[in-house]
Amino acid sequence: MKYRRKNGSDTWHFCTNCSKWPTSDYVERDSKPTTGELDNECQAKENNGTCSKKQ
């Protein structure tokens, strides 16, 4: 699964259908980040089964 955050931000996103999913000027990684925080919208989508993930 891919995780993205905007450059200069500490909030990581992991649902491609998140309204704040970064599409430019971002950092991407393949594993769960060990610093920063996970986006609340992404976590809500994950919990209710509507999170679209990028492999």
Predicted regions and their residues:
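Cys/His-coordinated zinc-binding microdomains
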Residues: 19-22, 43
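Short N-terminal "domain-start" leader segments
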Residues: 1-7
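Short, non-ligating residues that shape and space the ligands of small metal-coordination modules
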Residues: 24-27, 48-51
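Extended terminal accessory/targeting regions
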Residues: 5, 30-31, 51-52
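Short cysteine-rich clusters marking metal-coordination/redox-active sites
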Residues: 15, 39-42
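K/E-rich alpha-helical interaction surfaces of small helical-bundle regulatory domains
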Residues: 7-20
